[in-house]
């Protein structure tokens, strides 16, 4: 069964958990319980701020390192979910449901990509 990586895209420093509506955490918990019981959710987590991260780049045969925060970047990956679904349509439906539990005044995006499986793995 194919796996899909859902990358949560946010504008860093624009989402404040204190700004969430009172039912947000309960809605998210219920969705996570449902998706886990369905055997779809393999792993998920939020990511620490870019101020605590580094970017490594390979160019001209050398590795360069840039420490965050990355002020030139509007959107960053704020979290991820690894899903195992029967097809892309199912991955998209779970992703739509994930977005729908968020407060309406937040802007959150998802990039859903199928994991390329290695032959023989």
Functional labels for PLM-detected ranges:
Residues 1-121:
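Conserved, structured core segments of small domains
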């Amino acid at each position: 069964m194919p796996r899909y990586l859902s990358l949560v895209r946010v504008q860093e420093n624009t989402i404040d958990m204190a700004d969430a509506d009172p039912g947000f955490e309960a809605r998210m918990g219920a969705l996570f319980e449902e998706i886990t019981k369905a055997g779809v959710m393999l792993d998920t987590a939020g990511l620490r701020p870019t101020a605590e991260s580094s970017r490594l780049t390979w160019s001209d045969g050398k590795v360069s390192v840039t420490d965050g925060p990355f002020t030139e970047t509007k959107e960053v990956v704020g979290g991820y979910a690894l899903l195992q679904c029967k097809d892309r349509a199912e991955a998209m439906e779970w992703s739509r449901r994930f977005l729908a539990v968020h407060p309406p005044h937040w802007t959150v995006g998802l990039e859903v990509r199928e994991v390329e499986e290695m032959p023989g793995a």
